[in-house]
């Protein structure tokens, strides 16, 4: 069952990677051809966009990672295996999308703000966090196994 769920979640995981690559290529082409005007980073609009992207990263990355851990603690104690795996799959997909959201916004605003490096760093931090959401059968077993006292989980 863990292998099947990991396979299903890999569609979300690699789908977000493809979406990030498409966003990168699309924004590069749109900005380089002048279809989308580059926003000055020191303008009011540029600063507001920067604040929104940074705030989004500061909220969604910890919420996606730690929030999922808290949900797993509740799911772990369920008796019904089918419901347990169903809820795990749903919340793991939400975690992948939440963490990837900051990466996508960082990539889009990097080009939109004229290759502003701070947005590239936001996207890089989100990409590192996104790596920790990679679903594997072993990881699913560990996260859903009953918690033992003084036991290392990873």
Regions found by a protein language model. Give the residues of each.
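Cytosolic-side membrane-entry/anchor segment at the start of a transmembrane helix
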Residues: 1-22, 77-83, 142, 152
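Alpha-helical transmembrane segments of multi-pass membrane proteins
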Residues: 21-32, 65
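Membrane-interface helix termini and inter-helical loops of multi-pass transporters
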Residues: 32-43
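Alpha-helical transmembrane segments
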Residues: 44-61
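Membrane-helix interface/capping segments
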Residues: 62-84
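Short membrane-interface loop/juxtamembrane segments of multi-pass integral membrane proteins
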Residues: 76-98
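Alpha-helical transmembrane segments and their membrane-interface junctions
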Residues: 100-119
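Alpha-helical transmembrane segments and their immediate juxtamembrane interface regions
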Residues: 122-154
């Amino acid at each position: 069952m863990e292998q099947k769920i990991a396979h299903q979640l890999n569609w979300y995981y690699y789908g977000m990677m493809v979406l990030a690559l498409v966003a990168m290529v699309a924004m590069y082409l749109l900005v380089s051809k002048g279809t989308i005007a580059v926003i000055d980073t020191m303008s009011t609009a540029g600063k507001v966009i920067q604040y929104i992207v940074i705030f989004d990263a500061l909220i969604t990355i910890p919420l996606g990672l730690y929030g999922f851990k808290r949900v797993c603690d509740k799911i772990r104690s369920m008796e019904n295996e089918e419901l347990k795996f169903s809820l795990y799959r749903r919340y793991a997909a939400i975690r992948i999308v939440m963490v990837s959201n900051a990466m996508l916004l960082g990539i889009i605003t990097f080009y939109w703000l004229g290759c502003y490096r701070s947005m590239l760093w936001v996207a890089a931090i989100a990409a590192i966090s996104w790596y920790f959401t990679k679903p594997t059968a072993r990881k699913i077993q560990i996260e859903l196994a009953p918690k033992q006292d003084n036991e290392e989980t990873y």
